Amino acid sequence: MKEYQVYLERDRSRQQDFLYPLIFREYIYGLAYSHDFNRSSFVENVGYDNKFSLLIVKRLITRMYQQNHLIISANDSNKNPFLGYNXNFYSQIISEGFAIVVEIPFFLQLSSSLEEAEIVKSYQNLRSIHSIFPFLEDKFTYLNYVSDIRIPYPIHLEILVQILRYWVKDAPFFHLLRLFLYNFCNWNSFSTPKSTFSKSNPRLFLFLYNFYVCEYESIFLFLRKKSSHLRLKSFSVFFERIFFYAKREHLVEVFAKDFSSTLTFFNDPLIHYVRYQGKSILASKNGPLVMNKWKHYCIHLWQCFFDIWSQPGTIHINQLSEHSFHLLGYFSNVRLNRSVVRSQMLQNTFLIEIVSKKLDIIVPIIPLIRSLAKAKFCNVLRDPISKPVWGDSSDFDIIERFLRICRNLSHYYNGSSKKKSLYRIKYILRLSCIKTLACKHKTTVRAFLKRSGSEELLEEFFTEEEGILSLIFPRASSTLQRLHRNRIWYLDILFSNDLVNHE
């Protein structure tokens, strides 16, 4: 128990002070206002204008200095107590400023943990969406049961602020944060991805949501480490950046005194946890009994610690060999491969059946076709159609738009074990591009291709990937052919294409 107490004492020393003065720095709001809102992958794009005006920021700072932040007029509820008018505009800038300031201590902690783990160079690859799939290929073939968990949401804003206080020691900062949340959103309501608060304040909402998930995972992984002597080195970068606060001391003492036998029963060195897009996967080699124990632990953790009601029926436990789970735009399951080997010993011949497991990752063709139909590239019968709204663009811009979509889908789904579905998607986009060009020139598809000779240009839909791989492996044709059959994971994909988000 002493090593846990030392760890907690060290974490308390890293708490940050004096964030409140940073709220009134001009450059904070300059960074906030020039932030690219369209890079958000969790909430819908809000579409703010990214023009920057230092004069507007200076006026904002001046008016914030002149206001008395401790007095709220109850008779004038429609008027902004901070600035008097244009509440939505200033709410957006102030919330972005809050998010930038509060991200500073967590960024410093993450940077120090990366330096201690000596994996700064590989941090960019760990941010990739595809970095999760090589881990699944290495680990999931040895596991038997999987549990799909949807992280419960919403959570009350007051609970988030209280949890945040254990990380940052700055009372004026949190008073101002509470005042801001009270005036610019409904304090008694819950924060959800589709709420007005999350749409108008995307960066602050994303920070609060990610902080809530980080807090939940820190407790979950703390007990995971406590219940096993083996460390999960595969995800050390994510574990090392999680810091515990003084509130855990009581938790450590309780589990050490009263629940030691229970934790021994939980001991499972082959349990793995993966989180993605508000969901998580818990997989284990042991039977369903241990998985049920972890399931009920998660439910009690959400109900008791975060005051979120969650029912046991929302978490399903399935056998990997008989269940396909939807993961980041893929259908994934563990397939059993059976092979028969003939063995001969003296005059006797034996037939030995060997069963091996392989992670099968497939492109979900039906949801992807549905996304193409929703984007008006084809109809519900999978027949390509033209895109008349792009008719005002030049031929080069139209072809470039289709190629960009095809390129993004090709890169994202190149890890599929069966690529025939991907070729079908390329075929639909290719014909949709041809029909769009023919509709623009008011002619038929056959006449357009015959007149303009665009067949060679449109072959880029199928030859671009081959050209990229030929540059990487210029002298190995056999290697190139093998790469087309195998999976290729790209470690530079930070945001998924809009057509991929069909879950």
Swiss-Prot record:
User: What is one GO cellular-component annotation here?
Assistant: chloroplast
**Main location per UniProt?**
plastid
A single BP term in Gene Ontology: mRNA processing
Decide whether keyword RNA-binding is in the record. Answer: yes
Which domain of life does the protein's organism represent? Eukaryota
Keywords assigned by UniProt, alphabetized? Chloroplast, mRNA processing, Plastid, RNA-binding, tRNA processing
Q: Where is the protein localized?
A: Plastid, Chloroplast
Q: Name one GO molecular function term.
A: RNA binding
Query: What family does this belong to?
Result: Belongs to the intron maturase 2 family. MatK subfamily.
Q: Which PANTHER family match?
A: MATURASE K
- What is the documented function of this protein? Usually encoded in the trnK tRNA gene intron. Probably assists in splicing its own and other chloroplast group II introns.
Q: What is the protein name given in its UniProt record?
A: Maturase K
To which species is this protein native?
Answer: Caragana arborescens (Siberian pea tree)
